[in-house]
Amino acid sequence: MKDKELSQRKNDHLDIVLHPERAKQTIRTGFEQWRFEHCALPELALDDIDLSTRLFGRVMKAPLLISSMTGGARRASDINRHLAEAAQTLGLAMGVGSQRVALESEDNWGLTGELRRYAPDIPLLANLGAAQIGSLQGLDYARRAVEMVEADALIIHLNPLQEALQTGGDRDWRGVLAAIKRVVNALSVPVVVKEVGAGLSVPVARQLAEAGVTMLDVAGAGGTSWAAVEGERAASDHARSVAMAFADWGIPTAQALRQIHQAFPSMPLIASGGIRDGIDTAKALAMGASLVGQAAAVLGSATTSTSAVLDHFAVVIEQLRVACFCTGSASLSALREARLARVGDEE
């Protein structure tokens, strides 16, 4: 695919995600089905609650990941700068958008070592699609992607549904697992594997764990539906009808998270996919997530300014802190012991 076509596709994606009413879906994350048991005697000071954690040897001030968003649109440079600057200020992790376009064209789209200079102290994660990893140049792409942004780890994103539905998508996924194994064995940094909104199942998580992947991002259904996005940008009624049938396809985020954590309790997990606020964040952490990611929820702020991104996450962090306070949790480890009950099952 030509650089211009790839760039236009990325711009289309941004425009649609910024206007979610254009990509309608009804599936929800599942977090709305769960409630914390309220603690009326927390016996701690709100300001003393410790939200810090560590990722890939770096200290984070809160367990939040700015999930991968954009890496191939003309707007990407400013968006990624705003995100990186905010992540540095708040002590959050950041995953860059797909680096395919930057690797295959002469334009780096802002995905260079300059991004690391905006955010010298945070965990920064490079990002490539499974289709690129599975190509003949896959290992070279992986190494270059990490070097390009001086990353602490590489994210490999799995998006078979989106690829099957989009014009010019990568539809031959044979050998992807073997390619992931090669990258895991060859890279000097950890490898994280994520879905993009349809969720990871326990059998797939098992395959990835056996391949040596360090961390999984369940990236479940309930947030951005890439099937609906591709349906919105489809060039024909036929393509639109096929895509929109899958608008609610996938494993809801809470379900994917709980199932994988139960099956692999020692596997570090990221919960993303429709995380709305700090209460969803707290629920995800209590269900077994090590980190919680947001993308679409902060994209509008990221197109505006660093200050807007800071304002967005300041709200999320304060919501998380209050959730800890009202469950009597002085730290993230304590929050993971807080009682969650499914709505209707409370005793």
Curated annotation (Swiss-Prot):
A GO term for molecular function: NADPH binding
A Pfam family annotated for this UniProt entry: FMN_dh
Binding site for FMN: S67, S68, M69, T70, S98, N127, K194, T224, G274, I275, R276, A295, A296
InterPro entries (alphabetical): Aldolase_TIM (IPR013785), FMN-dep_DH (IPR000262), IPdP_isomerase (IPR011179)
The keyword DNA damage appears for this protein: no
Reactions it catalyzes: isopentenyl diphosphate = dimethylallyl diphosphate
Required co-factors: FMN; NADPH; Mg(2+)
Catalytic class of the enzyme: isomerase
Keywords noted in UniProt: Cytoplasm, Flavoprotein, FMN, Isomerase, Isoprene biosynthesis, Magnesium, Metal-binding, NADP
Cellular component aspect of the GO annotation: cytoplasm
Disulfide bond as UniProt keyword: no
Protein purpose: Involved in the biosynthesis of isoprenoids. Catalyzes the 1,3-allylic rearrangement of the homoallylic substrate isopentenyl (IPP) to its allylic isomer, dimethylallyl diphosphate (DMAPP).
Complexes and interactors: Homooctamer. Dimer of tetramers.
Similarity comment: Belongs to the IPP isomerase type 2 family.
Record protein name field: Isopentenyl-diphosphate delta-isomerase
The species this protein was found in: Cronobacter sakazakii (strain ATCC BAA-894)
Name of the coding gene: fni
